[in-house]
A protein has these predicted regions:
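Conserved N-terminal phosphate-binding loop of PLP-dependent enzymes in the Aspartate aminotransferase
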Residues: 1-117
């Protein structure tokens, strides 16, 4: 509509709030998306994903994408293992995390009421 590229930084939110990141929760489809160590369970990795027409610019060497360890084995193995775990049993890990999160939040609310905070 506006002829601009919409980029979404998912370095903090990617894979932490949902397997599809904040973009899934918010119902947004960016043209480009950045992700960080959550995709590899803390192993130093970063990545960029996006729509085919934009990613084709990278694939065709029209855009230089430098990096410290681009595509290194340990990082890529960590990504695959992390994604396997996060998607196991219909993403059950997220349901468990949200259940625990709700208990923690309920406890914090109770404490804040008790001490009039």
């Amino acid at each position: 509509m506006y002829n601009i590229v919409m980029c979404m930084d998912e370095v903090i939110t990617g894979f932490r709030v949902n397997i599809g990141g904040a973009q899934t929760v918010l119902g947004v489809t960016p043209d480009l998306c950045t992700m960080g160590k959550a995709i590899s369970n803390g192993i130093p990795v970063s990545c960029v994903g996006g729509k085919k027409e934009i990613m084709d610019c990278i694939r065709g060497n029209k855009v230089l994408v430098p990096g410290t360890y681009p595509g290194y084995g340990l990082g890529m193995a960590a990504v695959l293992a992390t994604l396997d775990e996060l998607t196991k049993d219909d993403c059950a890990v997220y349901k468990q995390v949200f259940k625990v999160q709700e208990k923690i939040m309920d406890g914090l609310v109770e404490i804040s009421r008790k001490y009039d905070i």
